[in-house]
Amino acid sequence: MRALETIATLREYRKSLKESVGFVPTMGALHKGHQSLIERSLKENSHTIVSVFVNPTQFGANEDFSAYPRPLEKDLALCEGLGVNAVFVPKTSEMYPYEIEKRLKLYAPTFLSHSLEGAMREGHFDGVVQVVLRLFHLVNPTRAYFGKKDAQQLLIIQHLVQDLLLDIEIAPCEIVRDSDNLALSSRNVYLNATQRKQALAIPKALENIKQAIDKGEKACEKLKKLGLKILETLEVDYLEFCNHKLEPLKTIEPTNTLVLVAARVGKTRLLDNLWV
């Protein structure tokens, strides 16, 4: 496995690849959720490249950039064990050669980025677009793999590819859950045993909402009340029902409904969702 630290070495390596290339962009602290993305890429492509880069532009002023876990040696060992061909591990100065005031300004589309996570984390998705477009430009993948857990991010990346006419297939990947049903996240390491038990209210709320939908309930307001009752011990940022354009829904639309939740357990903010 190649560990590529510079854009020059990445470009040289990429030129040598003649067949399909799968790409899994990450911020490191890899877990079984990332592993599932990597394994799918390995299955569907001749070559797989993973990036590990904690992107500063998608963190707000009061967020956990400096504290974000960076177990690079462990991440590299995981990738090598899975059979990844190369891992791109650039420094910030490689990805952002210019100071902020000299950079080209890139903005996520407002109709997808200013609600939900975008409303809670101003500028977050602008930072995501900044780094993902740069990585796409450098890696030039056949396919890129993103988890459905970050649903809003996935929708924005899909729109980015369509709007900028990029010849990249975006492959959405199912949410991976731990044995207790908590969605896997690099931030789960911040939870102590008591907090982890409290956090299980999140998947339980979504599961109960799904059961109610399966039994025929379509009124989003009733379903929201059901979910909020289960989440009452947590600090809920939002529990919303939207279509795939992130427009609010009053009634469930089969194959076009997202139930999105963000809640805090102690100081840890967790996301989860249900694709109906």
UniProtKB/Swiss-Prot annotation:
Statement: the UniProt record of this protein carries the keyword Translocase: no
Top-level EC class as recorded in UniProt: ligase
Chief localization: cytoplasm
Catalytic activity: (R)-pantoate + beta-alanine + ATP = (R)-pantothenate + AMP + diphosphate + H(+)
Its EC number(s): 6.3.2.1
Pathway as given in its UniProt record: Cofactor biosynthesis; (R)-pantothenate biosynthesis; (R)-pantothenate from (R)-pantoate and beta-alanine: step 1/1
Subcellular locations according to the entry: Cytoplasm
An example Gene Ontology molecular-function term: ATP binding
Binding site for ATP: 27-34, 147-150, 176, 184-187
Residues annotated for (R)-pantoate binding in this entry: Q58, Q153
Keywords in alphabetical order: ATP-binding, Cytoplasm, Ligase, Nucleotide-binding, Pantothenate biosynthesis
Active site: H34
GO-annotated cellular components: cytosol
GO biological process terms held by the UniProt record: pantothenate biosynthetic process
Binding residues annotated for beta-alanine, in chain numbering: Q58
Note: The reaction proceeds by a bi uni uni bi ping pong mechanism.
Role this protein plays: Catalyzes the condensation of pantoate with beta-alanine in an ATP-dependent reaction via a pantoyl-adenylate intermediate.
Subunit structure comment from the entry: Homodimer.
Family membership noted in the UniProt record: Belongs to the pantothenate synthetase family.
Protein name: Pantothenate synthetase
Lineage of origin: Bacteria, Pseudomonadati, Campylobacterota, Epsilonproteobacteria, Campylobacterales
